[in-house]
């Protein structure tokens, strides 16, 4: 008997009994054990999450917990199983097809799987038609671009974003949400050099008088300055291709204006599952979780997070949609959006412990000048003096480099090490504390 039927049976049996007998508890515990993603339960006496190893039949002695388990199993588990199995990112290109044909196959399979989901409170299957239309606009955009009709390609993309905006509340995707950042209002940027010593200005975007050296990036076109930041020094290092740390300089960026809006495309299947686990019991009966918007948004996220197949090529078709998206963001509602947050395509395995480490931010310049940097971005961020790796090494055992307490990034990919205790984690602590020490001395 599958989990759905077991949960239905538990719900039916529960309605027949005024008291919760042992057979109901055992059935509930069996369901809990079989769940791939399990809801969290709170100990009412301590307000702490009950560890999975402590959950047993007696955990399900009250009706509310049984109701939570039933609701999770019927409404949430099938959706989360689909998201974890079918919404993986980044997309890995296989075969020899052009990108438009490849993504058409990806979306066809995705839509077919959506049709298999039951129509319940958490998912309205009537929305699949709109999701499919949006996917078709994305593949048509890529097709037109590859055929050389760039202006028609953007027009098609704009039509697709109109469909998207009708179905998804853009405001709900807006990040400035501290939950996505380990330390409020702090971002990181890293550069490499064997000879040059960098200043604060060097850590900002490439100045306008040097725009000729700007190459194509995932979210920006050649010649257009864009500030790329990371949620951790680790993701900055990964994006640079894991260079020799002895050649690196790192700065911390402090956001001065908390009201800026950034389009958040960084919600991974792992993050979604993690948040649901944490908040489902707290919001039970007060909030109905609906996944239509996420299924629509995944079309856009996946189109922006296709791993580059040929790194050495000058033209990268995988950048077509993300570059169009940044242009759309700049044009939308008088450019009220400042940039885009997205997951790094460098990560191979997302876990509940590490997904917040691998977030990138692409923030385009907002005012063009003959030389120098964008004044508006300059007013928005306060940049620390860059710290060379060698400088950090001479201070890594000092109080300024002690791990920051209560980190939100406890684990790094492929390891079971606490990130805040790693050298890169301690570098971040040093950058933050070192800046404070210098500021106090001024």
UniProtKB/Swiss-Prot annotation:
<keyword id="KW-1277">Toxin-antitoxin system</keyword>
<comment type="function">
    <text>May be the toxic component of a type II toxin-antitoxin (TA) system. Neutralized by its cognate antitoxin YopB.</text>
</comment>
<comment type="subunit">
    <text>Forms a complex with cognate antitoxin YopB.</text>
</comment>
<comment type="similarity">
    <text>In the C-terminal section; belongs to the MbcT/ParT/Res family.</text>
</comment>
<protein>
    <recommendedName>
        <fullName>Putative toxin YopC</fullName>
    </recommendedName>
</protein>
């Amino acid at each position: 008997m599958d989990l759905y039927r077991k949960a239905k049976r538990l719900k039916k049996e529960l309605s027949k009994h005024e008291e919760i007998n042992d057979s109901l508890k055992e059935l509930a515990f069996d369901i809990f054990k079989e769940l791939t993603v399990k809801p969290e339960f709170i100990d009412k006496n301590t307000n702490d999450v009950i560890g999975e190893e402590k959950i047993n039949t007696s955990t399900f002695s009250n009706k509310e917990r049984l109701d939570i388990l039933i609701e999770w199993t019927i409404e949430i588990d099938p959706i989360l199983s689909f998201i974890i199995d079918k919404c993986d990112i980044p997309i890995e290109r296989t075969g020899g097809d052009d990108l438009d044909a490849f993504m058409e196959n990806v979306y066809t399979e995705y839509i077919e799987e959506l049709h298999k989901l039951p129509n319940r409170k958490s998912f309205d299957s009537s929305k699949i038609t709109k999701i499919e239309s949006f996917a078709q606009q994305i593949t048509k955009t890529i097709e037109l671009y590859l055929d050389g009709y760039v202006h028609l390609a953007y027009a098609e993309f704009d039509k697709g974003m109109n469909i998207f905006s009708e179905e998804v509340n853009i405001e709900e995707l807006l990040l400035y949400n501290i939950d996505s950042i380990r330390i409020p209002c702090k971002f990181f940027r890293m550069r490499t050099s064997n000879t040059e010593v960098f200043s604060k200005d060097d850590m900002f975007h490439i100045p306008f008088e040097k725009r000729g050296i700007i190459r194509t990036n995932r979210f920006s076109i050649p010649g257009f300055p864009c500030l790329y930041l990371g949620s951790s020094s680790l993701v900055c290092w990964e994006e640079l291709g894991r260079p020799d740390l002895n050649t690196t300089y790192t700065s911390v960026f402090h956001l001065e204006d908390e009201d800026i809006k950034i389009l958040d495309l960084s919600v991974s299947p792992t993050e979604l599952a993690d948040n649901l686990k944490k908040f489902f019991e707290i919001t039970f009966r007060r909030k109905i979780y609906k996944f239509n918007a996420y299924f629509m948004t995944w079309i856009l996220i996946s189109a922006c997070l296709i791993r580059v197949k040929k790194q050495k090529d000058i033209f990268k078709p995988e950048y077509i949609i993300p570059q169009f998206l940044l242009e759309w963001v700049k044009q939308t509602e008088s450019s009220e959006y400042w940039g885009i947050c997205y997951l790094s395509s460098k990560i191979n395995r997302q876990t509940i412990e590490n997904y917040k480490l691998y977030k990138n931010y692409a923030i385009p310049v907002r005012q063009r000048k003959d030389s120098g940097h964008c004044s508006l971005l300059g007013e928005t961020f306060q940049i620390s003096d860059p710290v060379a790796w060698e400088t950090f090494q001479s201070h890594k055992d000092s109080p300024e480099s002690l791990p920051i307490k209560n980190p939100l990034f406890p684990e790094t990919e492929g390891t079971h090490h606490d990130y805040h205790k790693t050298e890169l984690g301690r570098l971040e602590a040093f950058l933050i504390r070192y800046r404070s020490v210098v500021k106090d001395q001024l």
